[in-house]
């Protein structure tokens, strides 16, 4: 576009230049017969009275000659013109100014900004700077993902809700007091100490049949070990049909207090087949038989019939497969945690809430529940934005997903990421390296990065990440010198100056990044190398554990998950009971058959 504009400007200037050429030709025409000795003095006289033009027989000839010379000059200029980009021959990459970018993107008040580095902030009102607030944070162990990014942004206490994936519970412990003082309602899904957790029941958020399908799909995906492949998917498919039948039954037929995974396990135990040769119906079979009498087209029946079409041996194997998937719900602690719901996910876009999901950093056994939580949270927030609040949540929701690789998300997460901005939802994806992202989303990882307008690199040791950051920085044009020396009788010494290109940072230079610094990429801006944010300089640090503000203690024990009491009875105080006299009669096989027939 700039090239076309420059071309048009050159043509306009060339046409305008014809006017002074014609004017000059008319002025000097009366003097051309005397040659150059007369032309030069006449020019001085002519310029004293520039509009005194005398037409003569040589006027036309003089004008044409000057136009010819002018045209030749234009032609020579155009023939030698090249598309030069001085000092950019091998690349135009360069470092941006942290202060200049901060001035462009920061907003007032200071709390309504996302802290990227020590000197760069991005306002939370994305409509002003037209950048989404999705951020990819990449840093190895010890690079400061929690200290230099997660904690500072929670300390902002902005007018938004926060969903924090918190391995070990460190973030909640350090900033919980500050958030509580700032008016946040703190909720905790604690999978480390479940007796301290708020309850979370996925059944509460099942609005329609599609939600039930998503729940079962997510459950099976998140309980499948990474890298495992089933040679025969039949058993998982059949087990999912049985689970769908049970959940559909509870959703439409059971009272609310029975709609939970503990009841699913009760129903599954009621389907147990003790003897493969015994054709008697199980209690679960009887339950669905009653349902068939009342509503033969019930959706739960459709799935139950599909499951029940095999032999007794096959049904038993399907039950074992499903029981293995759900075995964690046999634990009293998890059954109690999922028996009711206290999280109220839909309200997160309506009032300031901080929801912490605490997961052990050395045990992923219960991470599947966090995966279900995230899937349902996206569904609830999107539904609330689209159908209740006119397209955008009144309170923005930001998800800080520390150790992102530890949870399983929907396969279409890249699509979810691309449409959440307009609804007031944003995500910070926090990884140790890009290899983790590639392992999770083999085909969509580049799309996920592309949907994050900010990329913050904190340092690390993973080679493919070094290469990616180096390529993202681009190449710059530099000056180089080459030296030559020849010895002998006619020895000489020479120095040559030339330009060449090199990466702004080579992969090995990325690896050697000073641990005090971070590299920040913002869409449409030059990259910035700046100091990581110093948490001790934040004005709210005094209210956190890092500023000696005390450690936050959450969740007094509210649920006695398993209680065993010893009852001491004084046997002497027990009244004697009169026992009725009982007689017994031994029957023959023939007599027994007559009684039972």
Question: What would you call each of these model-derived segments?
Answer:
Residues 1-143, 147-152, 195, 475, ...:
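Basic- and hydrophobic-enriched, low-structure N-terminal and domain-boundary segments
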Residues 36, 40-47, 105, 486-490, ...:
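Extended hydrophobic/Leu-rich segments
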Residues 128-425, 440, 444, 508-529, ...:
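P-loop NTPase motor domains
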Residues 155-157, 179, 437, 472, ...:
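Alpha-helix termini
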Residues 203, 532-539:
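A short, sequence-level motif marking secondary-structure junctions
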Residues 359, 363, 403, 431, ...:
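Short loop or secondary-structure boundary microenvironments that flank
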Residues 417-419, 423-519:
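Conserved ATP-driven motor cores of ASCE-family P-loop NTPases powering translocation/secretion/packaging/pilus
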Residues 472, 535-537, 546-551:
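Short intrinsically disordered coil segments
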């Amino acid at each position: 576009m700039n090239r076309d504009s420059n071309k048009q400007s050159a043509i306009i200037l060339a046409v305008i230049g014809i006017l002074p050429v014609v004017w000059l030709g008319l002025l000097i025409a009366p003097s051309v017969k005397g040659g150059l000795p007369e032309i030069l003095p006449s020019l001085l006289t002519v310029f004293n009275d520039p509009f005194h033009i005398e037409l003569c027989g040589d006027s036309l000839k003089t004008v044409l000659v000057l136009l010819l010379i002018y045209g030749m000059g234009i032609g020579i200029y155009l023939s030698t013109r090249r598309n030069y980009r001085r000092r950019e021959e091998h690349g135009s990459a360069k470092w941006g100014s942290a202060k200049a970018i901060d001035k462009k993107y920061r907003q007032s008040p200071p709390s309504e900004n996302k802290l990227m580095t020590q000197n760069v902030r991005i306002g939370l009102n994305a409509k002003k700077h037209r950048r989404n607030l999705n951020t990819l944070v990449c840093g190895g162990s010890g690079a400061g993902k929690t200290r230099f990014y997660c904690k500072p942004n929670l300390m902002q206490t902005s007018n938004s809700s926060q969903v924090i994936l918190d391995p070990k519970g460190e973030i909640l412990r350090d900033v919980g007091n500050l958030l509580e003082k700032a008016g946040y309602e703190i909720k905790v899904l604690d999978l480390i100490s479940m007796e301290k957790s708020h309850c979370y029941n996925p059944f509460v958020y099942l609005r329609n049949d599609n939600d039930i399908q998503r729940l079962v799909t997510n459950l099976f995906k998140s309980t499948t070990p990474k890298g495992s492949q089933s040679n025969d998917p039949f058993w998982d498919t059949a087990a999912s049909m049985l689970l769908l039948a049970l959940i559909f039954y509870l959703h439409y037929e059971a009272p609310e207090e029975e709609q939970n995974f503990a009841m699913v396990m009760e129903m599954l135990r009621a389907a147990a087949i003790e003897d493969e040769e015994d054709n008697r119906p199980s209690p679960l079979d009887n339950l669905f038989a009653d349902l068939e009498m009342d509503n033969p087209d019930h959706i739960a029946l459709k799935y139950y019939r599909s499951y029940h079409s095999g032999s007794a041996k096959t049904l038993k194997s399907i039950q074992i497969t499903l029981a293995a998937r759900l075995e964690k719900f046999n634990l009293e602690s998890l059954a109690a945690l999922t028996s009711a719901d206290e999280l109220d996910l839909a309200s997160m876009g309506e009032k300031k809430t901080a929801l912490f999901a605490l997961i052990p950093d050395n045990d992923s056994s219960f991470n599947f529940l966090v995966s279900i939580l995230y899937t349902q949270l996206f569904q609830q927030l999107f539904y609330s934005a689209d159908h209740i609040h006119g397209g955008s949540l009144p309170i923005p929701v930001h998800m800080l997903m520390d150790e992102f690789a530890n949870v399983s998300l929907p396969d279409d997460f890249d699509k979810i990421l691309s449409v959440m901005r307009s609804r007031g939802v944003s995500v910070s994806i926090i990884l140790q390296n890009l290899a983790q992202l590639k392992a999770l989303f083999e085909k969509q990882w580049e799309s996920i990065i592309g949907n994050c307008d900010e990329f913050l690199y904190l340092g690390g040791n993973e080679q493919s990440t070094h290469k990616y950051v180096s390529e993202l920085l681009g190449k710059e044009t530099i000056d180089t010198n080459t030296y030559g020396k020849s010895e002998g009788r006619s020895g000489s010494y020479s120095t040559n100056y030339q330009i060449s290109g090199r990466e702004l940072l080579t992969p090995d230079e990325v690896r050697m990044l000073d641990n005090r610094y971070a590299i920040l990429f913002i869409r449409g801006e030059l990259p910035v190398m700046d100091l990581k944010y110093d948490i001790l300089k934040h004005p709210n640090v005094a209210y956190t554990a890092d500023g000696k503000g005390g450690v936050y203690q959450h969740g007094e024990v509210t649920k006695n998950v398993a209680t065993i009491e010893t009852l001491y009875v004084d046997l002497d105080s027990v009244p004697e009971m009169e026992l009725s006299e009982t007689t017994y009669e031994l029957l023959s096989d023939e007599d027994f058959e007559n009684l039972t027939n």
